[in-house]
UniProtKB/Swiss-Prot annotation:
Gene it is expressed from: proB
Designated name of the protein: Glutamate 5-kinase
Binding site for ATP: K18, S178, D179, T222, G223, G224, M225, A226, T227, K228
Keyword list, A-Z: Amino-acid biosynthesis, ATP-binding, Cytoplasm, Kinase, Nucleotide-binding, Proline biosynthesis, Transferase
UniProt record similarity statement: Belongs to the glutamate 5-kinase family.
Length: 377
């Protein structure tokens, strides 16, 4: 019989895997755990061969950099931690490159701060880069930019970063590889009566309380069960399910596919539906775009908004802002994230798509892409 976790894993087409320092870095030597990385990448290659897309959110740069700079065995200051991150990033990426290379898979590093997933313009740019990399068959390896991040703009832990990446990438599954095989009613290492919870349909206060009670103290990283539930809450709101499972198994991803013990936290909706609901209901529109009847019909049919169908632009708004789209009778037909600021949108209104670059010197494609449009009902 297929478990809920196993079924979700099989059905997922785009998966974000969060790998913590405790898995990636050997606690005794402070070096990359090559054997574990090779096993993970072999499993990831099998997933890609099955038609799935894989993204990795990887800790480890600071831990690897501490060893390189001789900062182990004591508490580090913030500047020392940032220096360790700078020294460790190349070591981290080299480890991932070497582990994926035998499978003919390339990797690319993406460094983010919280602003990159919360400021819409930067969010759109990060999403476009991620999509391009995956389209080229490359595995994005994402980490927080610890070299420049400050307390005000840091995620705090890579569980929440992974959830934001899953949201940004439109993933349908987030896998948090942990030091425990899922959520329990209490910490099973302290309470022999603790019961495993295989499936969570809603994150209730009771579930959050269990996570607090079962919070694991990590030896190398910063995340515990409470942060994983917080991450799952973010992912769930974005239409992405979350799997919490034991990452230290010899073939961690194959173990999920085989139905080994894990906790599945179900998604609230599909990623696309959740994203469009966010556009429609959570963002304050910054301007108006008036379109002709043909463009209005195309939008209602699920098409992108091309500049040729735009009759008027009212701003000001920036690239990435939400705008209202109305027909020539003043009826709102959609809301969406615009790919041009209001000044550029006014310049290309009414132009054919192949004339945009000649007018602006660049092109971002349609004025609003269909993926970034929520049609009014």
């Amino acid at each position: 019989m297929t478990s809920g976790s196993q079924g979700a894993f099989e059905a997922a087409r785009r998966i974000v895997f969060k790998v913590g320092s405790a898995l990636l870095v050997d606690a005794e030597t402070g070096a990359a755990n090559r054997a574990w990385l090779e096993a993970f990448c072999a499993d990831a290659a099998d997933l890609r061969a099955a038609g799935k897309q894989v993204l990795v959110v990887s800790s480890g740069a600071v831990a690897l950099g501490r060893r390189r700079l001789g900062l182990t065995g004591r508490k580090t200051t913030l500047p020392e931690k940032q220096a360790a991150a700078a020294a460790g990033q190349s070591l981290l990426m080299r480890a991932w490159e070497e582990a994926f290379e035998p499978h003919g898979i390339g990797v690319a590093q993406i460094l983010l701060t919280r602003d990159d997933t919360e400021m819409r313009r930067r969010w759109l740019n990060a999403r476009a880069t991620t999509e391009t990399l995956m389209g080229l068959g490359v595995v994005p390896v994402v980490n927080e930019n610890d070299t420049v991040v400050t307390e005000e703009i840091r995620y705090g832990d890579n569980d929440r970063l992974a959830a934001r990446v899953a949201q940004m990438a439109g993933a349908d599954l987030l896998v948090l590889l942990s030091d425990i095989d899922g959520l329990y009613t209490a910490d099973p290492r302290k309470n022999p009566k603790a019961q495993h919870i295989p499936r969570v349909s809603e994150i209730t206060p009771e579930i959050a309380g269990m996570a607090e009670g079962a919070n694991a103290a990590a030896g190398v990283g910063t995340g515990g069960m409470a942060t994983k539930i917080a991450a799952a809450r973010i992912a769930r709101a974005a239409g992405c399910a979350t799997l919490i499972t034991l990452g230290s198994r010899p073939r961690p991803l194959a173990a999920i596919a085989a139905g080994e013990k894990a906790t599945l936290i179900e998604a609230g909706a599909s990623p696309a539906a959740a994203y469009k609901a966010w556009i429609a209901g959570s963002l304050a529109p910054q301007g108006w775009v008036t379109v002709d009847a043909g463009a209005a019909s195309a939008l209602l049919a699920g098409k992108s908004l091309l500049p040729a169908g735009v009759r008027a632009v009212e701003g000001p708004f920036d690239k990435g802002d939400a705008v209202r789209v109305r027909d020539e009778n003043g009826r709102e037909v959609a809301r969406g994230l615009v790919r041009y600021d209001s000044a550029d949108a006014q310049r290309i209104a009414g132009l054919r798509s192949d004339a945009i670059e000649a007018e602006l010197g660049f092109t971002e494609g349609p004025m609003i892409h269909a993926d970034d449009l929520a049609v009014a009902h």
